[in-house]
Amino acid sequence: MKILTKWLRAYLPGLSVDDPQLAEDLTLRGIAVEALFFVPTSVGKQKAQWNSVFEMDITTNRVDAMNHYGVAREAAAIYGLSVPDLRFDLPKPEHAASPFHVRIEAEDACGRFTARVLRGISIGESDDWFPGAEVATYFELLEQKKINNAVDATNFAWLAMGQPTHVFDLDKIEGGIVVRRARKGERLKTLDGVERALDAEDLVVADHARPLALAGVMGGWDTMITPATTNVLVEAAWFEPMAVRRTARRHGLHTDASHRFERGANFHAAPVASALVSRILLANGGWIEGELVDVRVAELEARTADRKPVALALSEVRRILGRTEDEEGITGTTVEGVLAALGCGLASQRVSESASQHDSDAAWLVSLPSWRLDLEREIDLIEEVARVYGYNRFANTLPAFGEGVRALPWAESEAAVRRTLLATGFHEAIASTFCSAAEASLTAPQPGLVVPLGNPLSEEAGVLRPSLVPGMLGMIAGNLHRDVSDVRLFELGTVFGGTTEKVEERPAVAFGAAGSVPEQGPLHPARAIDFHDVKGAVEQVLARFQARAVYFDRFPAEAGLTPAWLHPYRAARVAAEGATVGWFGQLHPSEAAARKLKEPVLVGELYLDRLYKLPLRKPMAREISRFQPVRRDFSLVLDESISWENIDQALAGLQIPELVDWRVREVFRDARLGTGEYSLLMGATFQAKDRTLREEDLQSFQAQVVEAVGKAGARLRS
């Protein structure tokens, strides 16, 4: 916004610094002057003059400084000056036959509404009607369009003191004023000429027959001021910020009034602004009929204007702000001077009954000014002390830190997973924590437990991700579509479940691969990546934890247990310690087609919360046996419903120290086997640490192995 320095100096006659210095000092105190430029102006036959204008960048929490008086108040605090209270004397009102009636029905959205009746007003072009304010010059320099003296008076009020006001043609109001919600089917033609269908949540200023204005946003066409207007109703009110924001957004409007009401206006400024507008309108004749009508809602007034005092201790100010370059540092007098200059009231109090009278024991109960809604806590007051005192006056010191850095409970486990996947050829990537509702329903482990966002950025980012898979698929597709043929990615992150009221978080890792495995020498040429490559990476991750029972299994497609994003016949479940810890396999063809992926993509996800509860497996050195190992092969026949994991678990339960290894050598399927059966060649290695195994030892071990696999559902092939 633009601030005219001539107008500022009208409030601060004792200000002696030049405009560039003023701009620098305001900027250092957080009231940023983005640019200082000089504008020539010539009004009438006067000689052209150069006037300086500040281009300000006021943060949204400082609505009190979005006007000339507010910036003058900041300058007064910086230089130790006093700024006069805004008071506008009006002529004594004439007696009204009956007082103007105002009623607030929407007590949750309108805390105060003032109305003043002016009669005999002449509507025309604005003259220099306000003492000390050359209106034509001011408006020209600030690029403010002049309309007529009534509308210009309301614009002058918000430029001067930041309080939006509105003027109605009184003769077009039926009965009194009612501040209420719009009713079904009501319509309102606003000052921009647009006829709007009102929503039941819209806040309106109405008379006894129809809506007259969108409260705090824009006035209505039917009651606007025209050259024929002689009787005027001046409105100055306080509207609840959220109510104004919602109404403005629904109708796609952003006005000077809504900009200020949305950020919180000064509850006590309404009567002052009303007096300012009235004084301007009465400059060319007319009179006031009746006293100012001032209707308030006690609950909103207590919440916004009459807030509880905040306790502030000098010791806390010094602890937070640290050492200054001045030897004396921040004193009680400094704190009192800064806060008083900002409009705060201070009541001194002792820290405790035994507190001494030293300056370090100073403490106050600070009453907050009604125009500073951004001040709520002790830390806010401390920030104000630092800001006005000057950030540049504090010494450069490092903050003290008394506690050690504590890592997350699973930091070591997470690092182990990361190192393992990096070592197996994967690259780490990071995706958004949001996804679409469709992706969430497809990949959520528990489909009903998806957490929607209250204010989503877009439909594609409408829920918290219940799985890392959507982000992983997006990253793989993005690489493949950009001619990156060989992709291996993983992401370590958090997934979300539960409900909006109780969101549950759990760590997870997703991984995806496509393309080929690079050549690893003449005996290992490049080849397409397959299911077993990904399975090997999963095994490496699981091997880092001391999980006793780790196995992989798959379910018939008819069972419907495989996640919808995986190929029903090319996927596996990962289990550890008797619980599911993840899934992996080839991406479902329909999902691949939806993402325009022409080559097979392998993807998976592990839920790490269960694994993180297990201790990490520590590398241990063991003595290598000096005695010869002996391998025995077992040709087994199994039903298709029995997997290798069943055999693996059966052998793991054997109490045979000499059984040091067992693994699949070959899988064979043939019609000559029984229906629904397959053959598996298993190799078992026996080795003792203290002797050479004899034939009778091996026969005993073999018998135990055959018995164990038999209990698991396998039989020796004849």
PLM regions: where:
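Long hydrophobic segments that form regular secondary structure
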Residues: 287, 333-349, 362-366, 479-483, ...
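RNA/tRNA-interacting regions in translation and RNA-turnover enzymes
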Residues: 1-354, 358-410, 415-417
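Short beta-strand elements
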Residues: 32-39, 82-84, 283-297, 394, ...
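A carboxyl-terminal module marker
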Residues: 2, 10, 19-21, 341-343, ...
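His/Asp/Glu-rich mid-to-C-terminal helical/loop segments that flank catalytic regions of hydrolases
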Residues: 268-284, 475-488, 699-707
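Short histidine-centered catalytic/ligand-binding loop motif
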Residues: 140-146, 259-266, 457-461, 513-531, ...
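Class II aminoacyl-tRNA synthetase-like tRNA-binding/catalytic domains
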Residues: 178-218, 222-225, 393, 398-507, ...
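Short glycine/threonine-rich loop-to-helix capping motif typified by GTGT followed
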Residues: 299-318, 368-380, 405-414, 441-449, ...
